[in-house]
UniProtKB/Swiss-Prot annotation:
Protein name: Hemoglobin subunit beta
Family in the record: Belongs to the globin family.
Function according to Swiss-Prot or TrEMBL: Involved in oxygen transport from gills to the various peripheral tissues.
Domain of life: Eukaryota
Tissue-specific expression: Red blood cells.
Organism: Silurus asotus
GO-annotated biological processes: hydrogen peroxide catabolic process
Keywords: Heme, Iron, Metal-binding, Oxygen transport, Transport
Binding site for heme b: H64, H93
Length: 148
């Protein structure tokens, strides 16, 4: 179990309160698919992912980005049991979807970059970044828990 300080809990809640999943999710997932094009293989049913403009304008990318960020809401609400909260999601990605778990780290990095660009250095300070990174590392580890 991860130990969270009161300050860390406050920072996570504060950042989460500023996030609009309808905006942040699509941008973060699009960034993943553009910067790391090999991740597109998991989204072959999404249609045209041939270039950045196609990815940014793809409604299936946008919709799934919202789902991904919405999934983080569960981790925010269950900070003391992220692994248990994500057990079924981890199993789905491992057993059914066969997603390489290293891609979760790439997506977390894309989400962090998206947030830093959105909020700027006055809000997304190094101290906030540190806590947010810890939170995402816990979420990524929980998603990878069911992999063998």
């Amino acid at each position: 179990m991860v130990x969270w300080t009161d300050x860390e809990r406050h920072v996570i809640a504060d950042v989460w309160g500023k996030i609009n999943p309808d905006e942040i999710g699509p941008h973060a997932l699009a960034r993943l698919l553009i910067v790391y094009p090999w991740t597109q293989r998991y989204f072959s049913s999404f249609g045209n992912l041939s270039n950045a403009a196609a990815i940014l304008g793809n409604p299936k990318v946008a919709a799934h980005g919202k789902v991904v960020v919405g999934g983080l809401d569960k981790a925010v609400k269950h900070l003391d049991n992220v692994k248990g909260t994500y057990a079924k999601l981890s199993e789905l990605h491992s057993e059914k979807l066969h997603v390489d778990p290293s891609n979760f780290t790439l997506l977390a990095d894309c989400l962090t970059i998206t947030l830093a660009a959105k909020f700027g250095p006055s809000v997304f300070t190094p101290e906030v970044h540190e806590v947010w990174q810890k939170f995402l590392n816990v979420a990524v580890a929980a998603l990878g828990k069911q992999y063998h």
